[in-house]
């Protein structure tokens, strides 16, 4: 095909897309749609702040209006293990409008975490620590550490060191009275 100058009134035409080119374009469009849908479904599937070992998922906003106690522990922390029966006792008779969760200081897989909770007879809901876990507090500098989150979602108290069921109940009563 001979090109003519624009001044002669002719334009250069590009050859039509071949069938192979059309198929490639169609394939890319379909691939982009699938990728976009997969991203949307993945995003919607991970719309929670934390998950417990028993598979329950939670958003902090859904816990608004409740008092939430979060206890950081580790199997290598003797005081943490000593306070676990106290936390279990507290969990058995939670004050009104109160939730209790424990979270292992070191990230573990679900099977590792399950084995650990069975080995140490941990009888409170345990949060699975993962990169996706969102808590209103940062990891504490030492253990055990217990955080009390108020109904507004803000940390109301941090207790560093061992706690007892009586101490937790007393502290919650004080905080609820001040609120």
Protein language model regions, located:
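Thiol/disulfide oxidoreductase modules built on the thioredoxin-like
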Residues: 118-122, 128-173
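Hydrophobic beta-strand anchors of alpha/beta hydrolase catalytic cores
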Residues: 69-70, 100, 146
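N-terminal targeting signals for export/organelle localization
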Residues: 1-51, 179
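Conserved segment of the thioredoxin-like fold in thiol-based oxidoreductases
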Residues: 82, 92-130
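Conserved hydrophobic/aromatic "anchor" residues
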Residues: 48, 72-73, 116, 124, ...
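Conserved redox-active cysteine motifs that mediate thiol-disulfide chemistry
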Residues: 72-89
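A short beta-strand-turn-helix
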Residues: 48-68, 135
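Short pre-active-site segment immediately N-terminal to redox-active cysteine/selenocysteine motifs
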Residues: 66-68, 72-76, 142
């Amino acid at each position: 095909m001979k090109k003519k100058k624009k001044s002669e009134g002719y334009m250069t035409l590009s050859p039509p897309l071949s069938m192979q080119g059309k198929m490639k374009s169609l394939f890319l469009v379909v691939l982009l749609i699938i990728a976009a849908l997969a991203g949307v479904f993945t995003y919607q599937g991970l719309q929670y702040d934390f998950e417990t070992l028993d598979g329950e998922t939670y958003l902090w906003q859904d816990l608004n209006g409740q008092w939430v106690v979060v206890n950081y522990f580790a199997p290598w922390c003797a005081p943490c293990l000593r306070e676990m029966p106290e936390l279990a006792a507290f969990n058995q008779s939670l004050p009104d409008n109160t939730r209790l969760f424990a979270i292992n200081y070191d990230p573990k897989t679900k099977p590792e975490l399950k084995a650990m909770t069975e080995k140490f007879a941990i009888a409170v809901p345990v949060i699975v620590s993962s990169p996706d876990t969102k808590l209103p507090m940062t990891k504490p500098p030492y253990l055990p550490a217990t955080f009390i989150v108020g109904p507004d979602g803000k940390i109301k108290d941090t207790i560093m060191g061992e706690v007892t069921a009586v101490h937790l109940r007393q502290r919650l009563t004080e905080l609820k009275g001040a609120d």
